[in-house]
Amino acid sequence: MRTLTLLITLLLLALHTQAESPQERAKAAPDQDMVMEDQDIFISFGGYKGTVLQDAVVKAGQACYCRIGACVSGERLTGACGLNGRIYRLCCR
């Protein structure tokens, strides 16, 4: 049930991202040009034990990153993450 909830949440996020108006995309375009190809963002999941994201995606002791490109050596693709209205790969070690 938790996995289903996570998948539905990711689907809704993807649909919302694609439903943005062209004006919103035009405003965001200059910011996206400044993003470097090798930039990564550290994702930390806080909150109560047993949250849907912690149970479905992140196990204790794992470090996850929101990657623009492919996962680096030693990481595996675990899911998707969003940043500035775009969907990226969630890579965990």
Swiss-Prot record:
InterPro entries attached to this UniProt entry: Alpha-defensin, Alpha-defensin_C, Alpha-defensin_N, Beta/alpha-defensin_C
Keyword annotations: Antibiotic, Antimicrobial, Defensin, Disulfide bond, Fungicide, Secreted, Signal
Places the protein is found: Secreted
UniProt GO molecular function: protein homodimerization activity
GO terms (BP aspect): antibacterial humoral response; antimicrobial humoral immune response mediated by antimicrobial peptide; cellular response to lipopolysaccharide; defense response; defense response to fungus; defense response to Gram-negative bacterium; defense response to Gram-positive bacterium; disruption of plasma membrane integrity in another organism
Pfam families: Defensin_1, Defensin_propep
Maturation-removed propeptide residues: 20-62
Domain of life, source organism: Eukaryota
Tissue: Expressed in neutrophils (at protein level). Highest expression in bone marrow and to a much lesser extent in small intestine.
Residue pairs linked by disulfide bridges in the UniProt entry: 64-92, 66-81, 71-91
GO CC list: azurophil granule; extracellular space
Signal peptide: 1-19
PANTHER family for the chain: ALPHA-DEFENSIN 1, DEFENSIN ALPHA 10-RELATED
Described purpose of this protein according to its UniProt entry: Host-defense peptide that has antimicrobial activity against Gram-positive and Gram-negative bacteria and fungi (in vitro). Exhibits activity against E.coli, A.calcoaceticus, S,aureus and C.albicans.
UniProt family annotation: Belongs to the alpha-defensin family.
Name of the protein in its database record: Defensin alpha 4
Name of the coding gene: Np4
